[in-house]
Amino acid sequence: GDVGTNAVAIRGNAPQFTQWRLEGIEIPNPTHFADLAGLGGGFLSALSTQVIGNSDFYNGAFPAEYSNALSGVFDMHLRNGNNQKYEHAFQVGLMGIDLASEGPISKKRGSSYLVNYRFSTTSLASGNDINLKYQDLAFKLNFPTRKAGTFSIWGLGLIDRNKADVLERSEWETMGDRSSGYNKLDKLAGGLAHKYVLDENTYIRSSLSATYSKDRSLADLHTDDAIINVADIQNSRWNLVFNSYLNKKFSPRHTNRTGITITELKYDLDYKVSPYWGLNKPMEQISKGSGEST
């Protein structure tokens, strides 16, 4: 990657082949505007440093629990909120407003909450004419019990909007000057997790989670006489994931993890693109369909 993106290229692989995981499950790329770039790098992480806990990064030789990744794996976790006192944070930067809050739900039981919300300051400053707008929300609720283990509820969501307006006709020099477009990206992930400690070296963790992502892209080419639609792309994906494993630490150098992951996949896509941009040709159906798999 470079300083202008959130891309990570590993062993020459494109950033889109990196797997992102949160709270033990695979999630859509948690980066704003990630799917607008062909390489999948994105612009800004949707996970604020206010909420990130212990995380692992693998650039090869993945453990058996990781699949569906060609280059690397980011295995991230949300930290628990402070269960003793309330803390709040407010930050303003060039790219956005960051609001965070954490504290106890019940001091007696040790339960806590953590929530973080960000909103692009560029849209606040420029209203509806700004090209890039984004929002993201992340939270985690933690509920320890005396005998039944620890329950947690977590979630992550991001909303991206990108609008490219055509230049004034007097400024047209290239085909890009005569193009306009609109992109909308929505991503959600969340779940319920349970961890039960059997002894100081053994625990069982189970979770039921869901992820959702939807992309919509429109592009028009402006001529002296008309506006021609050259792209209309819609892509939606849903995943329902059940995961459970037993973790056993035999020694400081030997830990075994045995479990199962069941994923139900659903998709719905509709791709219409003009095959010859600039030649004023109508759009053609490139791909259309829906389905599911487990």
Which residue stretches match the model-derived regions?
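Periplasmic N-terminal accessory/gating domains of Gram-negative outer-membrane beta-barrel systems
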Residues: 1-62, 73-79
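Transmembrane beta-barrel architecture of outer-membrane proteins
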Residues: 5, 42, 52, 69-71, ...
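Structural signature of outer-membrane beta-barrel domains
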Residues: 15, 25-27, 79, 95, ...
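Strand-connecting loop/turn motifs
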Residues: 17, 50, 83-85, 96, ...
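Short acidic, glycine/proline-rich loop/turn micro-motifs
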Residues: 31-34, 124-128, 165-167, 217-224, ...
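Extracytoplasmic loops and strand-loop junctions of Gram-negative outer membrane beta-barrel proteins
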Residues: 36-41, 57-58, 82-84, 122-125, ...
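Predominantly transmembrane beta-strands of Gram-negative outer membrane beta-barrel pores used
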Residues: 54-63, 71-79, 86-144, 152-156
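Face-selective signature of the C-terminal outer-membrane beta-barrel domain
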Residues: 142-160, 181-294
